[in-house]
């Protein structure tokens, strides 16, 4: 009789059926948090069945945000959920796509590694997928082998694209043994309003489709807008051949951070550790209960305007939104994110209309010229009103453009938006010029991942971080043009952080005597924020917004600001001295 290999690491697969967007990622993340709170070492992985190598070149409206890991991988937004709930950094291996798998297999075929074989989906593609799944069980940098690997399989059961991944997962159970592998299936139990009934047939059919490919789920997550009664849970357990203890009702929760409590109430974590024979302790709720108190018992509310291009699809700014909320948790404050389309801020009147009742303005990252003048207009409005501003990546670049325009460089722009501008205060990075020119691959070639920065002592950012040595994740091709540092200084904007060699501008800010809080960073600090450990920049920004709200500023009348385009000089030699510097003095908090 064949014996299965001894496996110190257990594997748990999360699949989905009936419909997409049921919350597989949040379910997997919440279970990971529960197992971690039981003292287990957990890591996570997402299998994405699209042919792109990574999501880096996808439209944010289609895919949502691109989450960048410490090692510079562009990954699915669910990896961000994993990091936030587990409170640990993951690597690029946490996201596997069909594009990656096929690229590797085809490259091996070209090198002759399959010499003599007909390369097929089974076994070559599935073997490559299995290899990437099993690699997650290897010890990490601290030589700690995970107790559990949770692997989320993207898509829904029945999709053609997902079949190789489901087959690979089935083979992992065959290779490691049923005692070492757990299948969790997330399914929809719809409520039909006309009849007032909950219907179980979609879940039954979804499980039947899963069983037809050789996978019998150990537990079912029933997604519904209300609790599923015991009678229906018993029916589903019978018809789907699942232990009744593994039929888990998960009604919609008030907050995503309540989901671990919902799963624990249904005893899913206890069922998993028993089934996989894992050592465990009781759940330590100390940290999570403190978080939930801050989530549900805020002492006040602040309104933060997120001025972006993709605000019609909030997942495009998921990590930014979560970092803002986490910054609020630190202050026992609820952050209400006001989604503002950047196009609405292109004129002073438009900016005043949409930003009149907010307490802070956040300018997120992005690409392309659409909406840029609106982001700059929002910064101009916030500067004059004394509104706190935080600029991320492109947001820093917009702060620099607005600052240099205010001291006479009215054609100041980015080489990304206006290659022929006479004053490219934002320029293409030297190692990106061939890529921008179309002479090299576009995907996966930006300045990606964690890079160090040195902060100026006593600066706002140094005070926020509590140190002058920091590391942040990046994703950009453009940088502040060092030839314009004197013009930046003339505007009052201070370069408060650079790369260790002093070359690349990483942080800018206005001194407190000019404005209470305008900070820009070339990085994406939102990617390192955790609900239980908010990022210090977001803590400082939300704190400044709370101060702004508390100050009860008197109205400040802003002089009419002419549209820049109406006053562009005819010659590039005229723009520095031919425009009156009439930018209104920034307001100070009273």
UniProtKB/Swiss-Prot annotation:
Residues reported in the UniProt entry to bind ATP: 21-26, 78
Catalytic activity: UTP + L-glutamine + ATP + H2O = CTP + L-glutamate + ADP + phosphate + 2 H(+); L-glutamine + H2O = L-glutamate + NH4(+); UTP + NH4(+) + ATP = CTP + ADP + phosphate + 2 H(+)
Residues that, per the record, bind UTP: 20, 199-204, 235
Enzyme class: ligase
EC number: 6.3.4.2
Known pathway: Pyrimidine metabolism; CTP biosynthesis via de novo pathway; CTP from UDP: step 2/2
UniProt: L-glutamine binding residues: 366, 394-397, 416, 477
Residues the entry annotates as binding CTP: 20, 159-161, 199-204, 235
Gene Ontology annotations of biological process type: 'de novo' CTP biosynthetic process; pyrimidine nucleobase biosynthetic process
Official protein name in the record: CTP synthase
């Amino acid at each position: 009789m064949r014996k299965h290999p001894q496996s110190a690491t257990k594997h748990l697969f999360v699949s989905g059926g009936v419909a997409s967007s049921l919350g597989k990622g949040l379910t997997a993340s919440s279970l990971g948090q529960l197992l971690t709170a039981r003292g287990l070492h957990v890591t996570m992985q997402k299998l994405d069945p699209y042919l792109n190598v990574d999501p880096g070149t996808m439209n944010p409206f289609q895919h949502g945000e691109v989450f960048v890991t410490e090692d510079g991988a562009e990954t699915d937004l669910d990896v961000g959920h994993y990091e936030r709930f587990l409170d640990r950094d993951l690597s690029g291996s946490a996201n596997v796509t069909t594009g990656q798998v096929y690229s590797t297999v085809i490259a091996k075929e070209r090198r002759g590694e399959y010499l003599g074989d007909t390369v097929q989906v089974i076994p070559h593609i599935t073997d490559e997928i299995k290899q990437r799944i099993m690699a997650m069980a290897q010890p990490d940098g601290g030589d700690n082998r995970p107790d559990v690997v949770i692997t989320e399989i993207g898509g829904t059961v029945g999709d053609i694209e997902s079949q190789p991944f489901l087959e690979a997962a089935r083979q992992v159970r065959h290779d490691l043994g049923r005692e070492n592998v757990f299948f969790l299936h997330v399914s929809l139990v719809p409520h039909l309003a006309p009849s007032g009934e909950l219907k179980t047939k979609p879940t039954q059919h979804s499980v039947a489709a899963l069983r037809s490919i050789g996978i019998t789920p150990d537990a079912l997550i029933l997604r519904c807008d209300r609790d599923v009664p015991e009678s229906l849970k018993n029916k589903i357990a019978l018809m789907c051949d699942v232990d009744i203890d593994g039929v888990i009702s998960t009604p919609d929760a008030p907050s995503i951070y309540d989901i671990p409590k919902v799963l624990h109430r249904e005893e899913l974590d206890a069922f998993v550790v028993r089934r996989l024979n894992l050592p465990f302790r009781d759940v330590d709720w100390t940290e999570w209960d403190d978080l939930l108190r801050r989530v549900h018992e805020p002492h006040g509310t602040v309104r933060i305007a997120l001025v972006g291009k993709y605000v019609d699809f909030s997942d495009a700014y998921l990590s930014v939104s979560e970092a803002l909320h986490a910054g609020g948790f630190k202050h026992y404050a609820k952050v209400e994110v006001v989604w503002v389309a950047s196009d609405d801020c292109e004129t002073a009147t438009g900016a005043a209309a949409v930003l009149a009742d907010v307490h802070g303005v956040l300018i997120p990252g992005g690409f392309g010229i659409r909406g840029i003048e609106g982001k700059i207009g929002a910064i101009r409005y916030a500067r004059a009103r004394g509104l706190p501003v935080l600029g991320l990546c492109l947001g820093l670049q917009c702060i620099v453009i607005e600052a240099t325009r205010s001291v006479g460089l009215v054609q100041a722009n980015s080489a990304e938006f206006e290659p022929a501008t006479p004053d490219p205060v934002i320029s293409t990075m030297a190692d990106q010029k061939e890529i921008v020119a179309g002479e090299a691959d576009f995907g996966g070639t930006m300045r990606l991942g964690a890079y160090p920065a040195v902060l100026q002592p006593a600066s706002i950012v140094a005070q926020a971080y509590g140190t002058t040595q920091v590391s942040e994740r990046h994703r950009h091709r453009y940088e502040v043009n060092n030839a314009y540092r004197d013009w930046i200084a003339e505007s009052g904007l201070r370069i408060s952080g650079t790369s260790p060699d002093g070359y690349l501008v990483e942080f800018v800010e206005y001194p407190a005597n000019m404005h209470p809080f305008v900070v820009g960073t070339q990085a994406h600090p939102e990617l390192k924020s955790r609900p239980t450990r908010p990022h210090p920049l977001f803590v400082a920004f939300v704190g400044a917004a709370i101060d702004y709200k508390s100050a009860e500023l008197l109205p400040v009348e802003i002089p009419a600001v002419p549209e820049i385009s109406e006053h562009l000089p005819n010659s590039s030699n005229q723009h520095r001295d031919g425009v009156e510097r009439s930018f209104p003095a920034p307001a100070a908090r009273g």
